[in-house]
């Protein structure tokens, strides 16, 4: 895979340039564009993934299905599709917007900062997973209600962006509705 970049944003969310992805994620991470996706199977179960230990930020942490950064000229939806293929080896239904204005800043235990405008999407797959071990070290298909209960009970076990997304009542309602419509 070619070198990925992030799209830098000003405080109003307007693109101002690009920076190589790994150079962008430091203790002083600039605001940039990302996306987050929750992937469901035909049973309405959510794919929860555990980030590979080689990941720069939040290694070994459980998170929603796929996250990443759109490339210059690429739509968020196309970026979700690209990363699902790359990380999980699956084809998905067209991603649906769940939480379009999600924005967060969080610092991992190693001091790496995420500072992102990060629209949230949901999609479905019926494909068998072909996990990329460089991205994902473990995964589980779970009922959404069980995942949300786990996040509420033990937020420290999940990525901060997943916890913050699940804390939004409208996003939670839309994810629940999405899971139920197989």
From Swiss-Prot:
- Kindly state what the record says about how the cofactor is bound: Binds 1 Mg(2+) ion per subunit. The magnesium ion binds only when substrate is bound.
Cofactors (names): Mg(2+); Mn(2+)
Q: Which UniProt keywords apply?
A: Cytoplasm, Isomerase, Isoprene biosynthesis, Magnesium, Manganese, Metal-binding
Residues reported to bind Mn(2+): 25, 32, 69, 114, 116
Renumbered to this chain, the signal peptide range is: none
Task: State where Mg(2+) binds.
Answer: 67, 87
Reactions accelerated catalytically: isopentenyl diphosphate = dimethylallyl diphosphate
Entry annotation: catalytic residues: 67, 116
Query: What's the Enzyme Commission number for this chain?
Result: 5.3.3.2
Instruction: Give the pathway.
Output: Isoprenoid biosynthesis; dimethylallyl diphosphate biosynthesis; dimethylallyl diphosphate from isopentenyl diphosphate: step 1/1
Q: Which GO terms describe its biological process?
A: dimethylallyl diphosphate biosynthetic process; isoprenoid biosynthetic process
**InterPro entries linked:** Idi_bact, IsopentenylPP_isomerase_typ1, NUDIX_hydrolase-like_dom_sf, NUDIX_hydrolase_dom
The record's top EC class is isomerase
Where is the major localization of this protein?
cytoplasm
The answer, when asked if Cytoplasm is one of the entry's keywords, is yes
Q: Which GO terms describe its molecular function?
A: isopentenyl-diphosphate delta-isomerase activity; metal ion binding
Q: Where in the cell is it found?
A: Cytoplasm
NCBIfam families found in the cross-reference section:
IPP_isom_1, PRK03759.1
Assembly behavior: Homodimer.
The family classification in the record reads: Belongs to the IPP isomerase type 1 family.
Q: What is this protein called?
A: Isopentenyl-diphosphate Delta-isomerase
Q: Which organism is it from?
A: Shigella boydii serotype 4 (strain Sb227)
């Amino acid at each position: 895979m070619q070198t990925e970049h992030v799209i830098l944003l000003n405080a109003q969310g307007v693109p101002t340039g690009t920076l190589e992805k790994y150079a962008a994620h430091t203790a002083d991470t600039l605001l940039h564009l990302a996306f987050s996706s929750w992937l469901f199977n035909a049973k309405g179960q959510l794919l929860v993934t555990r980030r590979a230990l080689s990941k720069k930020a939040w290694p070994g942490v459980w998170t929603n299905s796929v996250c990443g950064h759109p490339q210059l000229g690429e739509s968020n939806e196309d970026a979700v599709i690209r990363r699902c293929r790359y990380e999980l080896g699956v084809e998905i239904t067209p991603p649906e917007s769940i939480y379009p204005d999600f924005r967060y800043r969080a610092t991992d235990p190693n001091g790496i900062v995420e500072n992102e405008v990060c629209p949230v999407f949901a999609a479905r797959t019926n494909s068998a997973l072909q996990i990329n071990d460089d991205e994902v070290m473990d995964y589980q298909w779970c009922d959404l209600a069980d995942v949300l209960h786990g996040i509420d009970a033990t937020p420290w076990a999940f990525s901060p962006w997943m916890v913050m997304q699940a804390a939004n009542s409208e996003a939670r309602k839309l994810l629940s509705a999405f899971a139920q419509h197989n």
